[in-house]
Amino acid sequence: LEADFAGEVFLRTSETALPPSAAVAVATRAAEGRAVVLADSDIFGDDSISDLDNSKLLLNILGFLSLGSKEPSRDIATVRAVLTQSPAWLSMQTAIEELRPLQSKDGSIEDQSNHGEAAMWVEKVIEGINELAPKFPHQVDYLSQAIKDLQSWINSGFAIPDFYESLELFRPDRNRNNDVQHLAVFSMYTQNGNPNRNLEVLVTNTFWPDWLAQKEQKYSNPAFVPIEFIGFTSGYDNNSAVFFPETVAVREVSTYKWGGIFCDREAARFRKVVAGAQELLYLPLPYDAQELLDDQFLAQETFVLWDLIHDRTHSRGDLPFDPFMIKQRMPYWMYALEELRCDLATFRETLVLEAEGDRLAKYIRYAILFDRLFRFPITGNRVRNYDGLGGQIVFAHLHKKGALHWRDNRLTFEWEKVIDSVVELSNQVDALYHEGINRSRLAQWIASYEFVTGLVPPHPASNWAKGTDQLPSAGALKDVVNLVLDDEFPLNVFYETLNRKLGDLVLATKGITA
């Protein structure tokens, strides 16, 4: 190395080697990234690079050294503090929370005696938009229309609100640049959160580093917008981690153009719940898995790449139904299998990514596995909990294959069996979908039920478990759906224990951010 080398030296030869104390692993800044150089002959030897897992280890070392600092380049905490201490933001928050109890489930305000007060609070929201607008110059058209929609709501006598025009102009997908903030004002419900279409105010930060933009060229998903919370009203002080246009109150369905995923909330609650499960179950973890639990920024990176691949998978493969299931009423295990299919496909894709040297591939596998096993089944109530059922299916399959053991109140994995077992489950779900193309809807529901019950026992009082000849197959499909119990597939004894001991911890993740 040159005497004035300004990079980092990670490994050197020993003092007695020839040459002594020579650098064999170094890294330095290169434009916006890092360049890593390894003297591989001194680490493995040219004749042994293909032995054992040496080539994989070499790629892992390169990936690890190229990371540099794992901290984000920007201070989100400061950005949040500036917004949340702003008088305009505080005034808007107050106005929103004062409006909340006046609104009906559909967003309207029926009691005319409250209209005067409501108009005052909506005007406060409009004032706040005008004061904050200079901070969002890229949203000038949207914010102008949002004010018009709010004024139209007042003029309508607070009928069901209609934000169609402003929603058409709210396009975060057109500005997917790292650390770009967006202000959103809509009457909306929040998925897995507030079921009512209350007026909400939200400020988001786009999480779009260069490496993710490059990955999106391979995994094209133009509607995908990973975001972080900067500020939000209480409609998001819950478990909701998504921001979708279909949640907004509009007079007609708007074309699907974007979908926001709060990667900071996803990562933070994952880390908290899995760490709790690790302690409770005396779970020994590989170093990489522990690293994921210990590092919020790494977890966010992991979740955005998982989400990018998962989201696009909904429209790929053998699809015996509308993959997004919009306004379809089906037994809830159909939704469970669809979400699970996309996660399993993502899990498999990490094997391709890993072969290409992607540093996040192994972390995505741990994230999918642990989120599915530990958080999903005990989050939310037991009323048609389709995400929870997906986790129950994964547990049952891994347990059946001997890749997972729960003995002496301790959970262990046979890691050498895990990947093959998950891929096998993915193949089984794919086969179910492939064969479903030749079935009627009801026949596919029945085949899917039989697949699930092969792993997760149904409720003893299940109507469906009595046999297909007991189903009212001659009537409307809704009659068969109505026979599905709210908790058709109850938690097993493992999850009953996990829920009893970790339930409070899961509840404590309500409203969590990074």
Residue ranges, per PLM feature:
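Active-site recognition of the HExxH zinc-binding catalytic motif
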Residues: 303-319, 347
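Short pre-active-site segment immediately N-terminal to the catalytic Zn-binding motif
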Residues: 289-306
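Long, well-structured alpha-helical subdomains associated
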Residues: 300, 351-453, 458-459, 465-466
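Extended, compositionally biased alpha-helical segments that mediate assembly or anchoring
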Residues: 72-203, 435-514
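Short, surface-exposed patches at the edges or C-terminal ends of soluble domains, predominantly
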Residues: 1-73
